[in-house]
């Protein structure tokens, strides 16, 4: 079976957005379109099944027709909790996670991660300068380890990805595709550029 048909795309929109003053980043607009919708659209061109992990404004995300999954852990302790929640509530074998604030993810993201994963249960993007561990292709097999990690109070995404036996995939030729929007000032700069 083709691995691409077994991957569930996931827009991670469950964060607290502290650097954005608590505003739901996924709903901020870039050129008249919510940030999360850019990510969902890019995933839908690559995968047949896409869901959203969101803890606030779920009714707005649901208008898209996509399934919305809330974190199963209290206090929404970060992106790993979103990943775990999706794995607990979706039947898929593989999951391609992307944060809602990366509107320019490439349309070959799933294919490149899939083809370069070797036998790793998790792979993530490296843009030539830095790792992007929340843009990751993850196998369900790591779910028990992830639950244990979170129950131990750990939250560091990169540390977990390495612990799970993963490796980075080089996307240095597409570095600009992984710039994320963390502050209102960054969003304003992107508005001017695009």
Swiss-Prot record:
UniProt: Mg(2+) binding residues: 101
Protein EC: 2.7.7.77
SS bonds (residue pairs): none
Domain of life: Bacteria
Predominant cellular place of this UniProt entry's protein: cytoplasm
Keyword Transferase: yes
Molecular function per GO: GTP binding; metal ion binding; molybdenum cofactor guanylyltransferase activity
InterPro entries: MobA-like_NTP_Trfase (IPR025877), Molybde_CF_guanTrfase (IPR013482), Nucleotide-diphossugar_trans (IPR029044)
Classification via SUPFAM superfamilies: Nucleotide-diphospho-sugar transferases
Catalytic activity, reaction form: Mo-molybdopterin + GTP + H(+) = Mo-molybdopterin guanine dinucleotide + diphosphate
Magnesium recorded as keyword: yes
Description of how the protein assembles with itself and partners: Monomer.
Annotated family: Belongs to the MobA family.
Domain comment in the entry: The N-terminal domain determines nucleotide recognition and specific binding, while the C-terminal domain determines the specific binding to the target protein.
Descriptive protein name: Molybdenum cofactor guanylyltransferase
Organism whose genome encodes this protein: Escherichia coli O6:H1 (strain CFT073 / ATCC 700928 / UPEC)
Highest classification ranks of the organism: Bacteria, Pseudomonadati, Pseudomonadota, Gammaproteobacteria, Enterobacterales
Name of the gene this protein is made from: mobA
């Amino acid at each position: 079976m083709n691995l691409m048909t077994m991957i569930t795309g996931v827009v991670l929109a469950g964060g607290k957005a502290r650097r954005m003053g608590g505003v739901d980043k996924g709903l901020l607009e870039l050129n008249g379109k919510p940030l999360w919708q850019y990510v969902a659209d890019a995933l839908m061109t690559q995968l047949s099944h896409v869901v959203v992990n969101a803890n606030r404004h779920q009714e707005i995300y649901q208008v898209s027709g996509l399934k919305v999954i809330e974190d199963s852990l209290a206090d929404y302790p970060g992106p790993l909790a979103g990943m775990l929640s999706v794995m607990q509530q979706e039947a898929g074998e593989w999951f391609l996670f992307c944060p809602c604030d990366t509107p320019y993810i490439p349309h070959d993201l799933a294919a490149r991660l899939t083809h370069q994963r070797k036998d790793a249960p998790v792979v993530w993007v490296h843009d030539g300068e830095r790792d992007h561990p929340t843009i990751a292709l993850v196998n369900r097999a790591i779910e028990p380890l992830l639950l244990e990690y979170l129950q131990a109070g750990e939250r560091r995404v990169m540390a977990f990805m390495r612990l799970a036996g993963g490796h980075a995939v080089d996307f240095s030729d597409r570095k600009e595709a992984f710039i994320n929007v963390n502050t209102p000032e960054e969003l304003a700069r992107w508005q001017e550029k695009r």
